[in-house]
């Protein structure tokens, strides 16, 4: 615990996988602790590491306020049984809006990982940005203006997430 926040980890994090020279991918999501329409839903961040070919789950880290303990236990159980991201996609908890959402955050992490493995999405990790040729690329920073003012990547255009629909014309269609 760090004040009111819970930080939890299970399995192998990316740093350890790199040290062991194990080929892996990771995904990070930021779901709510329970149904968003129910009051007092709190943010959490879930990062998982997995084999990019087989989907075997290597590790997971979760930071949040509510429900972190049960989500990290779900990840630990899948890792113990040498499970995959496909097993995560099947995770279900009893649904009650004050405590969970219709799709459990761990299942959502599995869905995002599947999208990465199948090529539906091609993530770019922050550590890779300096190696990417940025010519003919459009780098969009969707943070708030206050967050953007704390520092940004060279050439990034700031359009806060809440304003994207109103400012679609500012987005380059060919980059």
PLM features per residue range, with description:
Residues 130-175:
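Positively charged, proline/Ser/Thr-rich regional signature most characteristic
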Residues 18, 79, 149:
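Short polybasic/polar patches that bind polyanions
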Residues 65-84:
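A short, polar/charged loop-to-alpha-helix boundary motif
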Residues 73-77, 90, 111:
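Generic alpha-helical structural context detector
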Residues 1-66, 101, 105-131, 137:
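Mid-to-C-terminal Rossmann-like scaffold of FAD/NAD(P)H-dependent oxidoreductases
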Residues 31-33, 92-95, 146, 163-165:
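Residue-level detector of flexible, active-site-proximal loop/helix-junction positions
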Residues 1-10, 81, 86-96:
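Active-site-proximal substrate-binding core of FAD-dependent oxidoreductases
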């Amino acid at each position: 615990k760090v004040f009111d926040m819970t930080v939890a980890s299970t399995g192998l994090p990316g740093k350890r996988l790199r040290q062991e020279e194990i080929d892996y991918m990771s995904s990070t999501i930021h779901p709510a602790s329970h149904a968003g329409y129910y009051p007092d839903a709190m943010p959490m961040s879930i990062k998982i590491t997995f084999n990019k070919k087989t989907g075997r789950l290597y590790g997971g880290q979760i930071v949040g306020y509510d429900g972190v303990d049960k989500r990290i236990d779900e990840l630990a159980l899948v890792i113990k049984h040498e499970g995959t991201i496909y097993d995560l996609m099947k995770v279900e908890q009893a649904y009650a809006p004050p405590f969970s959402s219709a799709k459990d955050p761990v299942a959502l992490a599995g869905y995002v990982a599947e999208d990465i493995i199948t090529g539906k999405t091609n993530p770019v990790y922050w550590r890779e940005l300096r190696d990417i040729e940025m010519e003919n690329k459009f780098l969009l920073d969707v943070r708030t203006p206050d967050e953007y003012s704390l520092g940004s990547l060279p050439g990034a255009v700031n359009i806060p997430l809440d304003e994207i629909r109103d400012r679609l014309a500012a987005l380059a269609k060919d980059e």
